Amino acid sequence: MRNLSRKTAIILAFFSLASFLSLAASEEGGPPAAKPAYLYKTTFVRAAPGKLLDLIALYKDRMASADESGDGRPLWWRHTQGDQWDLMLLTPMESYAEYYAKNKIARRKKAAEASGLSQEEFARKLEACSSWREDIFVMGPPLETVKKAFEGTAYYHIEIFVSLPGKQEELFKEREMENVYAVETGRPYNMIFVRDQGAVWDLFTLGCYRDIKHWAVGDEITKEQRAAAARKAGFNSPDEIGPYMRTLIDMHRDTMGVAIK
C-alpha cells in the first residue's frame, strides 16, 4: 500500500505543474511534460572482471530475439564514470498485463529458441559474465518520447535518488522545476522515471546529449538569463537549486556514459 500511495501522490503532483511545464517546454523546443504512465524495466549490470566486452556482446546477440518477439529492443548505454554498474538497459513493458500476457510470454520463448540462444542459456551466460544486477520497475514517459530522446544522442547522464521520508512528492516537483530551468537555459528536457517496485530508488532522471561537450557546456547564456530562468522555474536564484534539492534526498548518485555502437 505504501508503494501504491507514494506513486499515486507523485503522479497527482504532476498535474499541478503539467500545463505550465508543457508551455515552457514547447516555447523552447523541448518535449512537453509527459505523465509517467508507461512501464519500463530498468536493469543495471556490473560486468564480471574482464568480461565487459563479453557482456556487451551477449546483450547484442539478444537484440534480434527482442525484435522477433515484438517486444522491441531495450534502450541501453555504457557507464564511463559515476556509479558501480557498467550497463543500463531500459526495457519497454507498457504494463504488467501487456508484458506478461500468455501470448507475449510464448512469443518471447519462441523467438529466443529460434535465435539459437534460449532463455535458459542466456541466463546462464549472463550469470557467467556479470558480477551483479539490479532491477527497478518504473513508470516513465511514453515510449515514443523516450525513443525520440535517444535519437542522435551519444552521451547520457542519469541522476538517481532515494528521497527523505515523506519527501517523494516534493522531490518529483523539484525535478520538474529543474526541467523548466533546463529548457529555459537551452538544455535538453530530462525524462523522469518513478519507482513502481524493485530496487530502493524512488525516482531517476535521464538526460540525453549529443556528446560530452553538449552536456558540459550547453548554450552560452548570460548571468541575467540564468537568473530569469531560475525565477520562472520557481527558484529564487540558480544558486538555490542544488541546496534545495539536497533538503529532499537521503541519497543521490550521478552516472555519465556513452552510446554502445
Where are the predicted features?
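N-terminal secretory signal peptides that target proteins for export/translocation
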Residues: 1-6
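Bacterial N-terminal signal peptides
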Residues: 9-22
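Short S/T/G/P-rich N-terminal loop/turn motif that feeds into the first structured element of a domain
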Residues: 24-261
